[in-house]
Amino acid sequence: MTGFSNGAGLPSGVTVEVFAAAFEASPTPMVVTDPRRRDNPVVWANHAFLALTGYARDELYGHNCRLLQGPRTDAEVLQTMRAALRAGRPFEGELLNYRKDGTTFWNGMTINPVRDEAGQVLFFFSAQADMTDKHRL
């Protein structure tokens, strides 16, 4: 591909560190999980995700995103999401989630698998949005 280097799909002169800084600075809540580890734990989250959920990195890393679920989280949507992730497929939907302080928010999420060259899922990347105002209408 013209303008790309190292076969990694990065434009010439753009480093992984540049992407990491951009993701960290983004106002869009983002999280990465590792399905190769037991219970698919969070391995990275940006500042916007921490602000949305109220968790600090050390409280979140190593834990499954289930910690955002609560008694009013829709079990049917969860089942659909989990089936997609088990199959290595993308998922898009909304869930009622719970912040660390127990308050609820509607979480609109898009989850995509990140694969290696052989097609194996290495990570799941999720971009999220607070959809609470939409649900108040």
What are the language-model segments listed below?
Residues 2-6, 21, 25-28, 35, 90, 120-133:
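PAS-family sensory domains
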Residues 13-23, 98:
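Short alpha-helical capping/linker elements at sensor-output junctions, especially the PAS-family N-cap
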Residues 29, 43, 91-96, 101-110, ...:
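PAS/PAC sensory module
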Residues 32-41:
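Short acidic/glycine-rich beta-turn/loop cap or linker motifs at sensory/regulatory domain boundaries
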Residues 46-49:
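N-terminal capping loop/helix in small sensory signaling domains highlighted by a polar->aromatic N-x2-3-F motif
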Residues 52-56, 61-66, 71-73, 79-81, ...:
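PAS-family sensory domain signature
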Residues 135-137:
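Sensory-domain boundary/capping and coupling elements
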